[in-house]
UniProtKB/Swiss-Prot annotation:
ZnF C4-type span: 227-246
UniProt KW Secreted keyword: no
Organism: Olimarabidopsis pumila (Dwarf rocket)
Protein name in UniProt: Acetyl-coenzyme A carboxylase carboxyl transferase subunit beta, chloroplastic
GO BP terms: fatty acid biosynthetic process; malonyl-CoA biosynthetic process
UniProt cofactor(s): Zn(2+)
Gene that specifies this protein: accD
């Protein structure tokens, strides 16, 4: 549950109420005079507002008042008080059902009601002296189910014109640029369809934004990514798919990893046209194997679960293979095994250092024993590469790396590097528990646990990985090409 603290100053005293809001919310109903002690605000019948601790007073045309107990009904959960850089105050209100968004700089009525509510609520929970000024009134919020146009417009307007005079904090006390999304938008992140929305402000009565069928997931999903751990939003091109809020490492596509590791303009892919032909005619009632491959190809733009090729890493020529978990769970079939085998053979002939980035659920069951053969085939050519030619192979394990990949080339590197918090195992937790009838200790299959047991050489964050690889290559006498 998130909380909000509004920097609104109030004082204590006595308050007379001569009316309250009716349940209909669109009209006022008379009520008996109610006196609340310990509040220093008074309204008289002429609608003049006085502060007992102040010398000045002013009048404002106001209808009947509301009692403190009704303030939560009067001020909607969708109303926010903000202050701009010139210390001017505004109220911001939006109505989901009516598709209405309003910014008003004349909200003295609401401000009075809100002050009164804060004061009376605070008095019920405080025993401090009458002369104290109190800040940061605590208000419990509710879940906000916002449509996308409100989400986008509030964010753009706030960042352009208004400095929010409040702090939006999660339970972990992390504050970041996505606080607007986290506080206003629902945690589920579900997007509702919208038709035609107009947003206006009472300051200039002009339309700020008028859009049709605005959907952030359709127009901006190539720019933003959502953390699957804390649901925070971040700009994926800059942050390397590492959540700013919780530090969670999100999965990366193979193309993103290539872009992260290889110098621009130096990538030369290999065997791009190699595709699986369903060698054992695998039968499935749910979805034929051929259809699953076609679907994965359309989703990822890849022909299979690995990309191989050559390029330069800080000027050092390297052979690189990157597995893609989004293609059928990164499973290793005959095509994956053949492409990696050919890459290793090419690196052997050209005497290139080798990097294999692993992200796989293991052998592909739709290809039966042919997928298991790839483990031996890749291990065989790696033996020639490492033992006979004395070349340098670095294995990078990302989350998840399991099954046949872990049991073969994943753990055969001269240097084995893992990403932070990576899930690395041969058999998954569920399989072990069902087989042995014992619980698997929490974190026992995480990279940090494997490092302590000596199964890994290092855990390297993504932002440091390219530099670490460059230093390791130079340590093993692989240097950048001379630039003439």
């Amino acid at each position: 549950m998130e909380k909000s603290w509004f920097n609104l100053m109030f004082s204590k005293g006595e308050l007379e109420y001569r009316g309250e809001l009716s349940k209909a919310m669109d009209s006022f109903a008379p009520s008996e005079k109610t006196t609340i002690s310990k509040n220093r605000f008074i309204y008289d019948m002429d609608k003049n507002f006085y502060g007992w601790g102040e010398r000045s007073s002013y009048s404002k045309n106001v209808d009947l008042l509301v009692s403190s107990k009704d303030i939560r009904n009067f001020i909607s959960d969708d109303t926010f008080f903000v202050r701009d850089s010139n210390k001017n105050s505004y109220s911001i209100y939006f109505d989901i059902k009516k598709k209405f968004f309003e910014i008003d700089n004349d909200f003295s009525d609401l401000e009075f009601f809100f002050y009164s509510y804060c004061s009376s609520s605070y008095l019920n929970n405080s025993s401090k002296g009458d002369n104290d000024l109190h800040y940061d009134s605590y208000i419990k919020d509710t879940k906000y189910n916002c449509t996308n146009y409100i989400k986008s417009c509030i964010d753009s307007y706030f960042r352009s014109y208004i400095c929010i005079d409040s702090n939006f904090l999660s339970d972990s006390n992390n504050s970041n640029e996505s606080y607007i999304y986290n506080f206003i938008c629902s945690e589920s992140g579900k997007i509702r369809e919208s038709k035609n929305y107009k947003i206006r402000t009472n300051r200039n009565r002009s339309n700020l934004i008028s859009s049709k069928d605005f959907d952030i997931t359709q127009n901006y999903n190539q720019l933003w990514i959502q953390c699957d751990n804390c649901y925070g939003l971040m700009y994926k091109k800059v942050k390397m798919n590492v959540c700013e809020q919780c530090g969670h490492y999100l999965k990366m596509m193979s193309s993103e990893r290539i872009e992260l590791s290889i110098d621009p303009g130096t990538w030369n892919p290999m065997d791009e046209d190699m595709v699986s032909a369903d060698p054992i005619k695998f039968h499935s009632k749910e979805e034929p194997y051929k259809n699953r491959i076609d679907s994965a190809q359309k989703t990822t733009g890849l022909t299979d679960a690995v990309q191989t090729g050559t390029g330069q890493l800080n000027g050092i020529p390297v052979a690189l293979g990157v597995m893609d978990f989004q293609f059928m769970g990164g499973s290793m079939g005959s095509v994956v095994g053949e492409k990696i085998t050919r890459l290793i053979e090419y690196a052997t002939n050209q005497r290139l250092p080798l990097i294999l980035v692993c992200s796989s659920g293991g052998a592909r069951m739709q290809e039966g024993s042919l997928s298991l053969m790839q483990m031996a085939k890749i291990s065989s050519v790696l033996c020639d590469y490492q033992s006979s030619k004395k070349l340098f192979y670095i294995s990078i394990l990302t989350s998840p790396t399991t099954g046949g990949v872990t049991a073969s080339f994943g753990m055969l590197g001269d240097i084995i590097i893992a990403e932070p918090y990576a899930y690395i195992a041969f058999a998954g937790k569920r399989v072990i528990e069902q087989t042995l009838k014992k619980a698997v200790p929490e974190g026992s299959q995480a990279a940090e646990s494997l490092l302590r047991k000596g199964l890994l050489d290092a855990i390297v964050p993504r932002n440091l990985l390219k530099g670490v690889l460059s230093e390791l290559f130079q340590l093993h006498a692989f240097f950048p090409l001379n630039k003439n």
